[in-house]
Regions:
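Conserved short alpha-helical segments that host acidic/polar catalytic motifs at enzyme active sites
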Residues: 1-277
C-alpha cells in the first residue's frame, strides 16, 4: 500500500534474491513464490500477485492449478488478456462482478474447478483467504497482533526461524475446504463459505496421499517429470515440500531420482543373489 493504492513488486527471479523495503506505515503484506504450471515465468506479467480492480483495488495470489480457465473465458465472455496463467481467470471473475466481497468471492470459487487456495489483499488492508483443497497454514501471534500464513507448516517453521518469530507463542487458525476468511486492518475476522465442487474429490491417488501430494502428482507433468518418479520420492520419505523444492531445481531432482534408482537396482541384485544361493 502506498498513498491508498495497491503497489505490487514482483520479479522473475528466486524469492531469496528479492530485495525490497516496506513502505512506511505498512500493516499488511502478501507474497508468493510461483511453481510454474502455465505461462512462462520469464514474462513478469504471468507471475503472482496479480493486480485487480472491482469496487476497490486488490492484489491476488493463487496456490494450485485451475482446469477450466479456458472454458470460463468463453462461457463468461471475459476480456482477452496477455496474461497466460490459469490463475488470472479468478481475477477476471471478480472484476466482472464489480465488487470484492464475500458474495463475489463465493461466486468465483464456485465457478472455478481445480486445486486452489486464493489470497486477496485489498487497498484498505483487508486480507481474504478462499480455502479450497490446496494446503494453507495460518497462525496468529496475540502478543504481536500479527497474522502470518504459508502453504504448509514446514515452510512457516523455516520462515519463523529466519525472522525470529519462533520466539513468540502463536495459535493456529484452522480453515476447512469451502471457508472464506477476511481479516481487516484492525485484526477483526469474519467467516463465510462457498460450496465446494465435487469434481475436486472424485479422483484420489492410491495409498492415502494428502491434497498437497496429490497436487504435486497432478502438476509434475508440467515439468516433464513422470508421476512414477514423484511416487518414488514420496515412498522414500521425501515430503511434499522437499519435492516442490526439487521441481524448481532440476539438477537436484535428477540427482535424487538417480540415487533412488541405483538403490533399487542394488536391492534387486541383492535379492537375486539371495535366491540363487
Amino acid at each position: 500500500m502506498q498513498d491508498g493504492r495497491i503497489k505490487i513488486y514482483k520479479k522473475p527471479k528466486p524469492a531469496h534474491k528479492m530485495k525490497f523495503t516496506f513502505p512506511e506505515g505498512t500493516t499488511a503484506v502478501m507474497g508468493h513464490t510461483r511453481l510454474t504450471t502455465q505461462g512462462n515465468q520469464k514474462f513478469n506479467f504471468n507471475n503472482h500477485p496479480f493486480y485487480g480492480k472491482a469496487d476497490k483495488e486488490f492484489a491476488f495470489a493463487h496456490n494450485g492449478v485451475l482446469y477450466n480457465d479456458k472454458a470460463l473465458r468463453k462461457e463468461k465472455h471475459l476480456p482477452k488478456t496477455h496474461i497466460e496463467t490459469d490463475s488470472y481467470v479468478a481475477v477476471q471473475l471478480i472484476e466482472k462482478q464489480g465488487k470484492l466481497n464475500f458474495e463475489s468471492l463465493k461466486n468465483m470459487a464456485e465457478d472455478v474447478q481445480g486445486n486452489f487456495t486464493f489470497t486477496i489483499l485489498d487497498q484498505y488492508n483487508t486480507l481474504c483467504f478462499v480455502k479450497g483443497s490446496s494446503p494453507m497454514f495460518l497462525i496468529y501471534f496475540e502478543q504481536l497482533g500479527l497474522f502470518a500464513y504459508a502453504s504448509t507448516e514446514s515452510i512457516m517453521s523455516k520462515a519463523m526461524k529466519k525472522s525470529g518469530l519462533n520466539g513468540y507463542r502463536y495459535s493456529r487458525i484452522l480453515l476447512s475446504e469451502g471457508d472464506i476468511l477476511s481479516i481487516d486492518r484492525n485484526g477483526k475476522t469474519e467467516l463465510s463459505a462457498f460450496e465446494t465442487f465435487s469434481f475436486q474429490n472424485d479422483f484420489r491417488y492410491p495409498d492415502g496421499y494428502d491434497s498437497h501430494e496429490e497436487l504435486l502428482l497432478e502438476m509434475c507433468g508440467c515439468f516433464g517429470v513422470p508421476e512414477d518418479d514423484i511416487i518414488q520420492l514420496l515412498d522414500y520419505g521425501y515430503t511434499a515440500d522437499d519435492i516442490e523444492e526439487m521441481l524448481m531445481d532440476s539438477e537436484m531432482l535428477e540427482e535424487t531420482i538417480s540415487d533412488i534408482k541405483e538403490m533399487n537396482e542394488y536391492e534387486d541384485l541383492w535379492e537375486y543373489g539371495e535366491k540363487i544361493h
